[in-house]
Amino acid sequence: MAREFSLAKTRNIGIMAHVDAGKTTTTERILYYTGKIHKIGETHEGASQMDWMEQEQERGITITSAATTAQWDGHRVNIIDTPGHVDFTIEVQRSLRVLDGAVTVLDSQSGVEPQTETVWRQATEYGVPRIVFANKMDKIGADFLYSVQTLHDRLQANAHPIQLPIGAEDDFRGIIDLIKMKAEIYTNDLGTDILEEDIPEEYLEQAQEYREKLIEAVAETDEDLMMKYLEGEEITNDELIAGIRKATINVEFFPVLCGSAFKNKGVQLMLDAVIAYLPSPLDIPAIKGVNPDTDAEEERPASDEEPFAALAFKIMTDPFVGRLTFFRVYSGVLNSGSYVMNTSKGKRERIGRILQMHANSRQEIETVYAGDIAAAVGLKDTTTGDSLTDEKAKVILESIEVPEPVIQLMVEPKSKADQDKMGVALQKLAEEDPTFRVETNVETGETVIAGMGELHLDVLVDRMKREFKVEANVGAPQVSYRETFRASTQARGFFKRQSGGKGQFGDVWIEFTPNEEGKGFEFENAIVGGVVPREFIPAVEKGLIESMANGVLAGYPMVDVKAKLYDGSYHDVDSSETAFKIAASLALKEAAKSAQPAILEPMMLVTITAPEDNLGDVMGHVTARRGRVDGMEAHGNSQIVRAYVPLAEMFGYATVLRSATQGRGTFMMVFDHYEDVPKSVQEEIIKKNKGE
């Protein structure tokens, strides 16, 4: 089958926002107007088309990014709906990795919210062009220009309106297009009858002022336009549109639109803006990768003529077809039934069927082309972030960074039958979600699961019960602490056992130094002259990794340590891998005596919104929880307090805040960084873990 839409007429976009900004409703409306659904599902009724897991429909939030294909104005638009809840950061990251552009949805009453900042920062890291849709203009307290101001103040974004609202709250009835200088008036609530009129007189002056600001802002990003602007020449609408497109694709400018997805206003104009201003796969730089055979950097331009290269960005278990691997094709063509090389794992994989997804219904297709997003059935070894390429033209594309989990729970199966099922269920869930870890406590034999937050683990335990029919008891949430060294030291690990027959002998000298935050464990072999034979070096590294998994103070994994093996000795007969592994772990224990070991705890960036009268309470809450205030701002009659607070102190805070503010206070928290715990807290943690 020939290609249906050219690359220039393809858009791969994500819809990203803070939880509750109306993102899923916006996506629903897009699907409605592009003819994919005939009846609109309301999120708060639990009937939304994109939220197809039972947990999502119950909680009214989007957890997994469903990928959908739609058509608008002769273009194919592939949409990935991303979750706005902080616990599902990895879902946002993996979708940003494969998108070419995004629509950031704001709640017009609140403007930029904490999770908007998180996803905006991630999108900036990945260089994703964005347009902004200020949604919920029909809501009480909606304020479009306030929302635009928060983009400047909180995100330092060069964002400017290309539309203005006519009316607000109940009176929101239309939109002014600042490029055409026309008013679009909605005459019914389905958003299908739109009248294009002249701008009402009372809005004309404001519209002219904002059009002038828009032209100036766009001209600043383009020399030719700047010259025309300074010389007082008129900039045509076509030049303005081209200027906005270029600056948006270069991530130098962010057009802001307005509307109400719930009331069906402004969604079609937003779709027009997706086509007009967001890039096609041809507008963005070719993806880079490394040839696994030569280690040389290679590019894969977006073209059907290039060798096939794709990135797997999501694994899902589907009740009907089993394991689905979602992938983005960067170059080349792929037919169902063919073989590809998973260069990340070095394994050959067969693509069974290829499906194009529409929320939770699907259509089987024979071929995918450069720029497409689809799902494959039949891949056995592929996980999130793996590269799939032509067997004759191998390349490893940049993978997806996975954040470390910060919270853990103990899970215990209720019966022997549940025990076996639980193992399988947890393994499948971990395959789908790289931020979900499953570990068995060596000493107690308990199963511990770790993730990004309470909601994250709640949803996974719930899925284990519903999808895999596993009954389990769940312990209280615990913080995932880490351990590290704060000083450099040298230590010897010497292991010798002679007791009849073959003995054991391993002897190493290792220098330990603190590593940069987030760099993890790094091992360096600095052995000269073979004092430790080459075949035993991997055993030394393995011995360190295994013993670091259980720490030196309280049994928590060690991070951010460099280890340099620089001396040692061996025995011709008695030395073995096991002996050197044990010697390495003894060196680590010895180093702990002088390397100032420390326990690290996750620090959360907490944003608390509360009535002004309760500001004193909130400041007291932060201080009492070992937190430090980072900033405050007033919004209406509320105060917004930003603070860094240890996760360990935040359990149960929702109840405290609710009772202090009579239910009017809310808070959001997102993991920010790890920090040393105070000495007194460290001693308590060590005591507790030793069962004293």
Curated annotation (Swiss-Prot):
Binding site for GTP: 17-24, 81-85, 135-138
Domain tr-type G: 8-282
The entry's keywords: Cytoplasm, Elongation factor, GTP-binding, Nucleotide-binding, Protein biosynthesis
Gene Ontology CC: one annotated term: cytoplasm
Coiled coil: none
Biological-process GO terms, alphabetical: ribosome disassembly
Cysteines engaged in disulfide bonds, as pairs: none
Database matches in Pfam families: EFG_C (PF00679), EFG_III (PF14492), EFG_IV (PF03764), GTP_EFTU (PF00009), GTP_EFTU_D2 (PF03144)
Function: Catalyzes the GTP-dependent ribosomal translocation step during translation elongation. During this step, the ribosome changes from the pre-translocational (PRE) to the post-translocational (POST) state as the newly formed A-site-bound peptidyl-tRNA and P-site-bound deacylated tRNA move to the P and E sites, respectively. Catalyzes the coordinated movement of the two tRNA molecules, the mRNA and conformational changes in the ribosome.
Family, as annotated: Belongs to the TRAFAC class translation factor GTPase superfamily. Classic translation factor GTPase family. EF-G/EF-2 subfamily.
Protein name as catalogued: Elongation factor G
Lineage of the organism: Bacteria, Bacillati, Bacillota, Bacilli, Lactobacillales
